[in-house]
Amino acid sequence: MSLGLVGRKVGMTRIFADDGRSIPVTVLDVSDNKVTQIKTPEADGYSAVQVAFGKRRASRVVKPIAGHLAKAGVEPSRVLKEFRVEPEGLASLKAGDQVSVEIFSVGQKVDVTGVSIGKGFSGPIKRHNFSSNRASHGNSVSHNSPGSIGMAQDPGRVFPGKRMAGQYGAVQRTTLGLEVVRVDAERQLLLVKGAVPGAKGGDVVVRPAIKA
């Protein structure tokens, strides 16, 4: 249970190590993370830090959230996220504080959560990597069909969880154990090795790796 950051996926690029190796990295903008609430075991039954990220017009924020943010002295924000932390980690934080990218360090492993790119309604071959049927030799109009999806009169139904056509992508996914390659404190940017879920401009959540 450690404090993390909410950010925006800027895109991918590469940087070069001292030995000339090309390292693919994803750039994450984690600027403007502000503490909106400190939750304590005495008042809330558990210890956590709530942070706000991103800007939003005041007219687009519902009144309960607007009041909650105003109480913390934070501008209208787009994302609210809560991180469970140990009670000892609450002492140095208070509402209105800005959380810096420097809570992470080069070489540290992090988990990044985002919403994967949506591909729309897709067939089972694209969605589940099924094999195509024969292109000819007796096959008619079922080249990309999934094949049998059930049995006979008993059980007389399609079992839940059967892999079939449907919405592909646009689901929350987490990539585990990405290495922090660079921490840019001046611009509040975090560069992690490899790809993270989601499209450019998508919101992501960065936490210290749970399996590190």
UniProtKB/Swiss-Prot annotation:
A GO molecular function held by the record: structural constituent of ribosome
One GO process term, biological-process aspect: translation
The keyword Ribosomal protein appears for this protein: yes
Changes after translation: Methylated by PrmB.
Cellular component terms per the entry's GO annotation: cytosolic large ribosomal subunit
Gene3D superfamilies, A to Z: 3.30.160.810, Translation factors (2.40.30.10)
Keyword Cytoplasm annotated: no
Pfam families cross-referenced by the UniProt entry: Ribosomal_L3
Keywords recorded for this protein, A-Z: Methylation, Ribonucleoprotein, Ribosomal protein, RNA-binding, rRNA-binding
Source organism superkingdom: Bacteria
Annotated positions of the N5-methylglutamine modification: Q153
Subunit record text: Part of the 50S ribosomal subunit. Forms a cluster with proteins L14 and L19.
Its job: One of the primary rRNA binding proteins, it binds directly near the 3'-end of the 23S rRNA, where it nucleates assembly of the 50S subunit.
Family: Belongs to the universal ribosomal protein uL3 family.
The protein, known as: Large ribosomal subunit protein uL3
